Amino acid sequence: MRADCKRVVTDANGCVPVSILTIGMMDNNCFIVSAGREEGAPALVVDPAGDADAILKALGWLDLKYIVCTHDHNDHLVALPALQKATGAKVVAHPLDSKIIESGQPGYFGDWDAVAPVYVDRKVKDGDSIKLGSLEFKVLHTPGHTKGGICLYLPGFDGKPGLLFSGDTLFRGATGRVDFEGGSAREMRASLRNKLSALPDATIVYPGHEGLTTIGMERRRVIEAF
């Protein structure tokens, strides 16, 4: 596994700190979102890819409450066992993908992406909320890439745009693949058109790979075109 990672800290919506770690052999994005900047502020991690030590270093003085898994693919979970053990944070995933997470997975490309079993503390469904300090995230069930794929949506407030952590559902100019086991073009189309199309154009999209985008940028070229 590649040990280096690129970290970018952004206040993209003007009020919520988000750390972006691009890490691992497949250049995954791992996100740290906190409900404040002070020491001990509650935080969550979305998709613990790559290296747990790098994520722990980036967390610094934050208090990790949740580790949210957008889906069950190895490249997004490699750091999950070590990160959960080190922090005691609660693991969150959809029930349809929790079984694989709790069973563990062998490596697809070698030992580097094998994932040991981890208990999913909270199995969330569409419409559920995750509260983090003063922030309240909404769970969107978005199957298509996997049966239990989810996005995490933080509505905008104080005139600022919302944030969408889209996993491998929506990228900049593309969607996640639908030809893997558990994938479905029909379900992906429904997720895009019934769930993501309802979000405001200004919503900032934090995808599982590559750079940031917005719902408005992807509405015509991906969401409505798929």
Regions found by a protein language model. Give the residues of each.
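Metallo-beta-lactamase
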Residues: 40, 106-107, 112, 129, ...
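Conserved beta-strand hairpin/beta-sheet module of binuclear metal-dependent hydrolase folds
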Residues: 6-62, 151-166
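Conserved beta-strand segments of alpha/beta enzyme cores
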Residues: 17-19, 90, 122, 136-138, ...
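Conserved S/T- and glycine-rich ATP-binding loop of Class I adenylate-forming
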Residues: 33, 70, 142
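Active-site HxH/HxHxD metal-binding segment of metal-dependent hydrolases
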Residues: 42, 50-135, 161-162, 221-224
